[in-house]
Design a protein with these regions (language model features):
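Active-site entrance/lid segments in N-terminal catalytic domains of soluble metabolic enzymes
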Residues: 1-81
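Surface-exposed beta-strand edges and their flanking turn/coil or helix-capping segments
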Residues: 4-6, 103, 134
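Short, functionally important structural connectors and interaction interfaces within domains
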Residues: 12, 28-29, 91, 95, ...
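Active-site beta-loop-alpha junctions enriched in small/polar residues
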Residues: 21-23, 61-67, 93-95, 122-126, ...
Length: 177
């Protein structure tokens, strides 16, 4: 991780984002992505090495935990912040949920209670109403768009307008789409 951090910085990276949220089997099978939610000590070794090697801010993306029996995102977030991570994004599902069911935005709020750095909520932000509800339920400082933006390149502008009226764009009508 330290070497990758140095290489990324040499190529001009403005931040280093550690992705511990990927649920794909080909990623988690090698103790990467959200599989790191099963071994927080190992995850912290990687986070600490990255922060130590970084001259730019380090951010972290994770899920709520591996499964509903290990909802350890608040603990990992607290430890990551103490190690120097500057922003944390939480996807409101466990790894075992993949993308099924609904994201649990209120569970993201438990991470908000554990940290002081900016918190970004992720998962099921597919409408302006969802974005408002996600922010309200999670207490997050912002949202990260994912699958909800597929095929809708204007979606970030709509969310910007929602958060700061007049700064973004309005959602296009069906005719405009």
């Amino acid at each position: 991780m330290a070497e990758g951090t140095r290489v990324a910085q040499d190529f001009g990276a403005d931040i280093i984002d550690i992705n511990m949220g990927c649920p794909a089997r080909q990623v988690t099978g090698g103790l990467s992505g959200s599989a790191l939610m099963r071994d927080l000590d190992h995850a912290m070794t990687l986070i600490e090495a990255t922060v130590k090697a970084a001259a730019v801010p380090v951010t972290l993306k994770m899920r709520l935990g591996w499964d509903h029996g290990t909802l350890n995102a608040p603990e990992l977030a607290r430890r990551a912040e103490a190690a120097g991570v500057r922003m944390i994004t939480v996807h409101g599902r466990t790894r075992c949920q993949f993308y099924g069911g609904r994201a649990d935005w209120s569970a993201i709020a438990r991470v908000r209670e554990a940290i002081t750095v900016p918190l970004i909520a992720n998962g099921d932000g597919v409408s302006a109403a969802d974005a408002r509800a996600m922010l309200a339920a999670s207490g997050a400082d912002g949202i990260m768009l994912g699958r909800g933006a597929y095929g809708r390149p204007w979606w970030p502008g709509v969310i910007a307008n929602l958060l700061d009226p007049g700064s973004g764009i309005m959602e296009p009508t069906l005719a405009e789409e």
